Swiss-Prot record:
GO molecular function, one term: serine-type endopeptidase activity
Species of the source: Meriones unguiculatus
Prodomain residues: 20-21
The protein, known as: Mast cell protease 2
Organism lineage: Eukaryota, Metazoa, Chordata, Craniata, Vertebrata
Position of the signal peptide: 1-19
Sites where a glycan is attached: N80
Amino acid sequence: MHLLALHLLLFLLGSRAKAGEIIGGTECKPHSRPYMAYLEIATSKNYLSTCSGFLIRRNFVLTAAHCSGRSITVLLGAHNKTAKEDTWQKIEVEKQFPHPKYDDYSVLHDIMLLKLKEKAKLTLAVGTLPLPAKFSFIPPGRVCRAVGWGKTNVNEPTSDTLQEVKMRLLEAEGCKHFTNFYHSSQLCVGNPKKMQNVYKGDSGGPLLCAGIAQGIASYVRRNARPPAVFTRISHYRPWINKILREN
């Protein structure tokens, strides 16, 4: 498919292309996903957008590179993002580290680290999520869970409460219709026969497989039909480790 046609068909899951949601999923038990981060983003054009992300260290959040902006505030300890609780911790981002090879057109290398201005306080509602080992392989057929505050229907606003959905890992063949899909650095996720998917607003949220973050929500077709493309975290462990070590 020609790149222009691809971009007519696809949109980024993040708020730069309107915030997304979990379709066909269920509401999470409050604070059962303590690593989840809700990102409030002021773009370079002074628009407000949102993404999801997840805490991997007390002062670092992992998300998608297309969720970058002029400034970002991270909300931790939230379930309903519109109903303030004592569990909330709002922390500004000190520095954004989008992958140096991220391409906004092909959406390759869609991964970013956010260094927080202060360390999060670890509580029952705020915790960290482990990452996979370097270049570890997760086989197709595995059923994982995507988590985020995205839409629950294509024509609905984003969800106020945290949602999750079960999604199956597919062979690379399942995403052959995406011109720029690379199996080595991306995951093809979601049964095309089921209307269960991530969508706008879920960008940057994790794909959880046995309690480990294996993927980062990147993009999906405009009509929200599965499969979706996630950034494969294990491929980027050397880069992640370098940023964490040096900062």
